[in-house]
């Protein structure tokens, strides 16, 4: 009988800790729904004690997602654990994930606690969490740099208190595959009650080995849960990539001998959604989800693939959700045809109002752009869904601009502030700079522009531009995304989207730095 590997996604918690990747509640909900559609086993929806916003997001997701276990992180104290339990109350199935650092460096320098104090706090935290659920996970933070004897002592105690998952964290990406795999193996062999818990791996990519370490923890160590994120999103160099773990285990089932319950056809759509929301573009040569992942430039490779796909392809692009980017609709296409194509693409909208708004956007685009591709439709729906859920303190209305050779461009932007239209006019070093100056002249946000990037959604000069804007103010970093065939209009939409998030986003506590 084949074992099952549990996929624990922490995009909404650890992934969001990547600078600039912060998400609104509405964005977290959209990603959580996609993760559920993908059949992810456990979704770590956030860190309930970090902010009221995170608590609310976890609470809402817990009520909406029915087929995945919802999890909240909590430090090893009663206050955090109580907050997590309260946030998770609406869930069909939930888990409390509590942690404390166990390495000598962290205990001395960060916690300023003795090993005995850490031992006792870990034990009591799990005992308290068990009052709310029998599904409790414990992580020894910086486990890969912890003393083996002490680690065994702590883990034996928390399992005795009722921890059902033990997660070995390679917090700073220090591990290498053979050593990390043997660490998990040794723990399972030395801890007398290790059979009472599932062992899990959580690796960071600082040395580029997060996926390799995780797979070693599974193959060598016998771990049966992998903690990972979509696109490998995460602090510093990122986390273990969900798509790489899943496809490695599925493609090399002959070696790993494990099943995963993931619907792999949802991998690419979810990857694109996370990229669009966070503004973190997926590198073209990224395994599984990169644009070049299934591209063959070499003539020899192309010839081989045409004769027999398995000569150079070990996976099928369609199995992970890649679809041919074909022309599907035009300006004469009706609402039913639009709705049917959305269903074929696996795209869903929450209401008829959102569908109607997206269809109107499609008709407007079809009048301006001769050829409408699947990617155009996905971009329209994604932005419309975001707009429907975004708290629109500011709303883009229109844009006009004037530019002559030898003179600074001038932009005129009309937008609404709490329903009241205002007009900003300004010059700048280029049309985008002038547009941003016009908006800032009326808003006066005092924010700093950290990132401006443009991505063509399809090919050709009529392609829609997808613009990402990243703003920072008082330590908060937010992203805004806008799409339009007019790059400057897309830029204005993205800037206003970022301002809306800056206006509504609350501060959060980073669990590793508090």
Curated annotation (Swiss-Prot):
Its main location: cytoplasm. GO terms for molecular function: 2-isopropylmalate synthase activity; acetyl-CoA C-acetyltransferase activity; manganese ion binding. It is an enzyme of class 2 (transferase). Residues 5-268 form the Pyruvate carboxyltransferase domain. SMART domains: LeuA_dimer. Its EC number is 2.3.3.13. Residues 395-514 are annotated as: Regulatory domain. Its cofactor is Mn(2+). It comes from the Bacteria. Mn(2+) binds at residues 14, 202, 204, 239. It is found in: Cytoplasm. It catalyses: 3-methyl-2-oxobutanoate + acetyl-CoA + H2O = (2S)-2-isopropylmalate + CoA + H(+). Keywords: Amino-acid biosynthesis, Branched-chain amino acid biosynthesis, Cytoplasm, Leucine biosynthesis, Manganese, Metal-binding, Transferase. One of its GO terms (cellular component) is cytosol. Pfam families: HCS_D2 (PF22617), HMGL-like (PF00682), LeuA_dimer (PF08502). Pathway: Amino-acid biosynthesis; L-leucine biosynthesis; L-leucine from 3-methyl-2-oxobutanoate: step 1/4. One of its GO terms (biological process) is L-leucine biosynthetic process. InterPro entries: 2-IPM_HCS-like (IPR050073), 2-isopropylmalate_synth_dimer (IPR013709), AIPM/Hcit_synth_CS (IPR002034), Aldolase_TIM (IPR013785), LeuA/HCS_post-cat (IPR054691), LeuA_allosteric_dom_sf (IPR036230), LeuA_bact_synth (IPR005671), PYR_CT (IPR000891). HAMAP family: LeuA_type1. Homodimer. NCBIfam families: leuA_bact (TIGR00973), PRK00915.1-3 (NF002086), PRK00915.1-4 (NF002087). Catalyzes the condensation of the acetyl group of acetyl-CoA with 3-methyl-2-oxobutanoate (2-ketoisovalerate) to form 3-carboxy-3-hydroxy-4-methylpentanoate (2-isopropylmalate). Belongs to the alpha-IPM synthase/homocitrate synthase family. LeuA type 1 subfamily. This is 2-isopropylmalate synthase. It comes from Burkholderia cenocepacia (strain ATCC BAA-245 / DSM 16553 / LMG 16656 / NCTC 13227 / J2315 / CF5610) (Burkholderia cepacia (strain J2315)).
């Amino acid at each position: 009988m084949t074992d099952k590997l549990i996929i624990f996604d922490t995009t909404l918690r650890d992934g969001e800790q990547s600078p600039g990747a912060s998400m609104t509640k509405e964005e977290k909900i959209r990603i959580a729904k996609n993760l559920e559609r993908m059949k992810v086993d456990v979704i770590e929806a956030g860190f309930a004690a970090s902010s009221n916003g995170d608590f609310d997001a976890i609470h809402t997701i817990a009520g909406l997602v029915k087929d995945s276990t919802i999890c909240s992180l909590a430090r090893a104290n009663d206050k955090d654990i109580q907050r997590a339990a309260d946030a998770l109350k609406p869930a069909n199935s939930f888990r409390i994930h509590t942690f404390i650092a166990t390495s000598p460096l962290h205990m001395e320098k960060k916690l300023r606690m003795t090993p005995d104090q850490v031992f006792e706090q870990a034990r009591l935290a799990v005992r308290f969490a068990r009052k709310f659920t029998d599904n409790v996970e414990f992580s020894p933070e910086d486990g890969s740099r912890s003393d083996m004897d002490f680690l065994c002592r702590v883990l034996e105690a928390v399992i005795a208190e009722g921890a059902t998952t033990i997660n070995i964290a390679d917090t700073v990406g220090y591990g290498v595959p053979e050593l990390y795999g043997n660490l998990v193996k040794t723990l399972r062999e030395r801890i007398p009650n290790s059979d009472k818990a599932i062992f899990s791996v959580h690796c960071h990519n600082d040395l580029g080995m997060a996926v390799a370490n995780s797979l070693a923890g599974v193959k060598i160590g016998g771990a049966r849960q992998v903690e990972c994120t979509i696109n490998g999103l995460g602090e510093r160099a990122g986390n273990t990539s969900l798509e790489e773990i899943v496809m490695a285990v599925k493609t090399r089932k002959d070696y790993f001998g494990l099943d995963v319950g993931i619907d792999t056809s949802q991998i690419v759509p979810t990857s694109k959604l996370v990229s669009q929301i966070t503004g973190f573009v997926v590198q073209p040569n990224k395994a599984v989800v990169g644009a070049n992942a299934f591209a063959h430039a070499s003539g020899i490779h192309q010839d081989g693939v045409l004769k027999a796909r398995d000569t150079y392809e070990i996976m099928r692009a369609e199995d992970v959700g890649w679809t041919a980017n074909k022309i599907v609709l035009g300006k004469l296409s009706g609402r039913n045809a639009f709705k049917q194509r959305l269903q074929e693409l696996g795209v869903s909208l929450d209401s008829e109002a959102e569908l109607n708004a997206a269809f109107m956007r499609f008709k407007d685009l079809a009048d301006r752009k001769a050829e409408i591709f699947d990617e155009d439709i996905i971009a329209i729906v994604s932005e419309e869904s975001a707009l429907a859920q975004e708290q629109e303190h500011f709303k883009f209305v229109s844009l006009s601009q004037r530019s002559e050779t030898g003179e600074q461009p001038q932009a005129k932007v009309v937008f609404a502030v709490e329903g009241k239209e205002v007009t900003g006019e300004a010059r700048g070093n280029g049309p985008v700079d002038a547009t941003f100056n016009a908006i800032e002249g009326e808003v006066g946000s005092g924010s700093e522009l950290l990132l401006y990037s443009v991505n063509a959604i399809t090919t050709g000069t009529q392609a829609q531009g997808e613009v990402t804007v990243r703003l920072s103010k008082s330590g908060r970093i937010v992203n805004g995304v806008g799409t339009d065939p007019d790059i400057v209009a897309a830029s204005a939409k993205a800037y206003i989207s970022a301002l809306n998030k800056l206006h509504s986003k609350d501060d959060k506590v980073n669990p590793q730095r508090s």
